[in-house]
Amino acid sequence: MKNHELLCRLALTQLPGIGIAGAHKLLDATEGKVAMLFDHPKDLGDIIPGISPKIASVFDAPEVLRRCEAELSFAEKNHIACLTCDDEAYPSRLRECDDAPLVLFYRGISDLNQRHIISMVGTRNATDYGKDICMRFIGELKELLPDVIIVSGLAYGIDIHAHRAALQHKMETIGVLAHGLDRIYPSVHRRTAAEMTQCGGLLTEFMSGTNPDKQNFVKRNRIVAGISDATIVIESANKGGSLITAEIAESYHRDCFAFPGRINDMLSLIHI
């Protein structure tokens, strides 16, 4: 893909009032040539008949384009791959989802289309029971599927223990982030994240400078669910991000599993 088209697709994700559904509609309407919308903003009524003036007006966006140019320069300097949804390296499982990101930023060595990919999620307040499950299950999984990639969200609790268990068993593991690749949140996981770029990778749809705000974690969860064959919940209370991920996985018609919990354990109240 030419750099200008990549730039414009990234800019499309940053425009106000478009959203992911609208972005996909515009991508289809232009047959994958989003650049024409930015190159000829005053002619959008001819390019896409029926487009509302309000939507058309946001494509006159030089500041957005400048910011996205800076982001692509940042990516190049930091060995970050920018993947659009029609790139061969873009996760094919995720591409099947209606709300798949138009652009992903990826730093790592793992094939995002590996034959077997499993997502593991759970509470941020992991118990010894949950930590033990992570270590034992991932070890047994390696014996069954030596090429499997473990995906999680690099958060406290089950997420980080799943990543570390995979690394300990010399397996590839990918962390999906709720912010840009200019930082690691939480910062105490930087060392693990650095290891993962050499044995797995870090993946996000967010540009650098993006804060790890609450709504970004929900968006992150759909990538965790969509990139894998199945999602496994280790520990979770009645509510939480891991259950949101499980619900998203089911909406994508992906397999979803949960480990049985201990009686009267508040972190074992899930029913899938």
Where are these regions (language model features)?
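Short, positively charged patches
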Residues: 1-143
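Glycine-biased, small-residue-rich flexible motifs in mid-sequence functional cores and linkers
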Residues: 1-3, 84-270
